[in-house]
Design a protein with these regions (language model features):
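Outer-membrane beta-barrel architecture
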Residues: 72-76, 112-116, 140-142, 170-175, ...
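Repeated loop/turn-to-beta-strand initiation elements of outer-membrane beta-barrel proteins
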Residues: 81-86, 118-125, 146-152, 175-185, ...
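Outer membrane beta-barrel transmembrane domains
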Residues: 109-111, 123, 210-294
Length: 312
């Protein structure tokens, strides 16, 4: 009996050992190959653009070439989130009938500095424009969510001589884009410090200009792009004090200011662009708080600019 029990125990032990060998898999060593990819860091400076521009502004009845001729040299530097601009140039007037005998006067110098911080759908920046007779300080912001966009320039003019300082806000708070066309409301508001700016007919304290503006592309080619901007004056107002007796002031009649601007850009290659625009305004004025004798003076206004830009 004992022999049978020993024999049975031996058989069970051998069977358990054989079963364990069948169930437990053999462990194999696996060698992993790790590939380290070299990551190239993003460049700190994305692009550098240099260029020059010439702008000629003129109102009917004034200089026969340009009451303001603006020549600027500019350099722009862009990083991942920042855009920096520096500009230097000259502002003068030009007339073939100049009393001084030349085609242009000595004019004034101009310097501009700007820094813009770009976020996902909006931006915030500052700009300083320094001229011989005034300085102009900007706080700039704007947003763009595709169909809806807007911008604002809050400005302060620090003037010399007998000119009063004033604050100015230019704003398009809400623009709507329908396909290729964008439409929005524009406000230009000025508020003079102190008692206001002394004019020939009184003291100007405030002014406001309300417009409707529309933008549309005209042509988009391989090298040439053309676009159009239209401005309709809705209402123009001015606040005067101490108006001289029987002397009024003028504003354009409601819906009687029209401006058309054609913008053009021609890409000679991937780096070099030639650009420009032409603007023409037609206004119909009316007298307020008195009579005026110069209603039609300055009813036409034009601007022309041409420039080039090279991007490294």
């Amino acid at each position: 009996m004992k022999k049978k029990a020993l024999l049975l125990g031996a058989i069970l032990a051998v069977s358990s050992s054989a079963y364990a060998k069948e169930v437990l898999p053999a462990v194999e060593e696996v060698q992993e190959t790790v590939i380290i990819a070299e990551v190239t860091p993003e460049p700190l400076i994305k692009s550098v653009t240099v260029g020059q521009s010439l702008e000629v502004d003129n109102t009917s009845g004034k200089k026969n070439i340009g009451e303001d001729v603006i020549f600027m040299n500019t350099a722009e530097l862009s990083t991942e989130n920042w855009d920096y601009t520096i500009g230097a140039g000259k502002v003068f007037s030009s007339d073939t009938h100049s009393r001084e005998g030349g085609l242009y006067d000595r004019g004034t110098s101009r310097m501009e500095l700007q820094a813009i911080r770009n976020f996902d759908n909006w931006f915030l920046g500052i700009k300083v424009q320094s001229n011989d007779d005034y300085d102009r300080w900007y706080l700039r912001t704007g947003y763009d969510y595709g169909m809806f966009s807007g911008w604002m320039d809050a400005q302060y003019y620090s003037q010399e001589k007998n000119n009063e300082d004033y604050g100015r806000i230019e704003i398009m708070p809400f623009n709507v884009t329908f396909g290729p066309i964008k439409v929005g409301y524009y406000l230009d508001y000025k508020d003079y410090t102190g008692k206001g700016q002394v004019m020939d007919n009184g003291v100007l304290e405030k002014s406001a200009d309300h417009q409707l503006r529309a933008y549309a592309p005209l042509y988009n080619g391989e090298k040439l792009d053309l676009s159009l901007e239209y401005r309709l004056g809705l209402h123009n107002s001015m606040d005067y004090s101490n108006l001289k007796k029987d002397e009024g002031y003028r504003v354009y009649k409601d819906f009687n200011y029209n401006a058309m601007i054609i913008n053009a850009n021609y890409a000679l290659n991937d780096s070099f662009d030639i650009y420009g625009y032409y603007r023409y305004d037609i206004s119909k004025f009316e007298a307020k708080d008195g009579t005026i004798t110069n209603e039609d003076n300055g009813k036409y206004y034009g601007e022309f600019q041409i420039g080039w830009a090279y991007t490294f």
